[in-house]
Amino acid sequence: YGSAGWGFWNHSMVFDISMPIWFIHLKSRGPYMLQGFFAQVKNHLYPVKLYGPSLSALSLVSRLTRGRLGVVIHSGKPALQDLDLTQWHVYRVEWREGAVSFYVDGRHVATLPLRGQEYRARADVWIDNAVFGYNRRDAGRVYRHLTQENRVRAYLEVDYVKVT
């Protein structure tokens, strides 16, 4: 339980400047709306695989309210629901001016907007025992860790990373 992922990040948890451009896997015990594997740019998410119910209603509300829920979910339907995350895959992130495209094994799974400030980020690969919560009234205006207890070892194996 927790999060794992790979991509690019500017290493900030502050709402207004946090800039992840990555694939992220989120799994939590208990109520957490984002249970699955997603492509993400800033607070924009596209589901690749879901572990819970459809996100169709949440997707519609998040788009109509322009992210007031903390995220904008671009589709309620996952791009590759049958994806087996226990197998090896080739993931690609194409970061271009105005948009980022995501691919799994050469299949396009999402394109998300990239707007606003100038973006600088480092390559980032991680596995963590936390998912992240958004509360727009948070005094520090940061995403908070929602720590998950894990009683078994977890692994994230990476064969290679190529940045061009």
Language model regions located:
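Short strand-turn-strand beta-turns centered on an Asx-Gly dipeptide
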Residues: Y103-R107
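Short clusters of small/polar residues that mark proteolytic maturation junctions
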Residues: P113-L114
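Ligand-recognition surfaces built from glycine- and aromatic
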Residues: E118-T164
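Secretory/extracellular carbohydrate-interaction modules
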Residues: Y1-R63
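Surface-exposed cleft-lining segments at the edges of enzyme active sites
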Residues: T65-L80
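Short tryptophan-centered beta-strand motifs in secreted/extracellular beta-sheet-rich domains
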Residues: Q87-W95, V100-F102
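Extracellular/lumenal carbohydrate-interaction signature centered on repeated Trp-anchored short motifs
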Residues: L80-Q87
